[in-house]
Amino acid sequence: MRPRLAIFKFASCDGCQLQVIDVLGRARPRLGDLAEVLEVEHFLEARSRIGAGPYDVGLVEGSISTPADIERIKEIRRQCRFLVTIGACATAGGIQALRNWGRIDDFLSAVYATPAYIKTLATSDPVAAHVTVDFELRGCPIDAGQLADVLSAFVIGRKPRLPGYSVCVECKERGTVCVAVARGIPCLGPVTQAGCGAICPAHDRECFGCYGPDRQEPNLVSLTGFYERHGASRESLGRLVQSFNAWAPEFRAEHDRLVGDGAGRETRGP
């Protein structure tokens, strides 16, 4: 009997689910025929048929942003033997976590005609803030090759093989000139987990930290201090780390050290 796979969505843009379709749809032959060895039971992005749980593996895209989301993710956790969060929204709250530095009532009043009807949390949370997660697959969006490795690892019973180094290594591998040293552009590559293939530096752009903080204790204070000494303002560096993975603990702490944590913001609430 094939392992049963389920894919779920919360607050997100669907980009990571499109990568799942890329892998399971065999758009990249080098990834193998994973669709042949996994039984996709729940995937509303790609099909309307829903197979009831329990499931062997659950992939979750998106952040938790409403009280209903909390109850739903708890039920998903109960239904999945292994739970894997995919993408920056699920692993770190996503770009929508920028609201976490403000007051939720201010946002509700600005967006909705009748804010009292809206039930939301004060923060956009990673899935791991509410349930136990077995594995996190980072990225905005995730890399199809890394996803294939994680699913293959589950099927054959081994640990996933993901990069244990920063984006700087990927720049060296592809022969990309360092934008920080050669061009004087503040770049998060030295403190960001590899996985994208250093796409932005290859186009003379700084790394924006799409894959989150490097797993090897990233030294953001040292990096931002270097950029400050070369003319970057604390405000611009605070904005640099306040992007797709802004609510990741390491990036969040460095932002707050540089520019403050937003006086008066709420931390939790319906």
Locate predicted features:
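Short gly/pro/ser/thr-enriched loop/turn and capping motifs at secondary-structure boundaries
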Residues: 89-94
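Short, hinge-like loop/turn segments at secondary-structure boundaries
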Residues: 100-104
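Iron-sulfur (Fe-S) cluster-binding modules
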Residues: 1-59, 64, 68-70, 74-82, ...
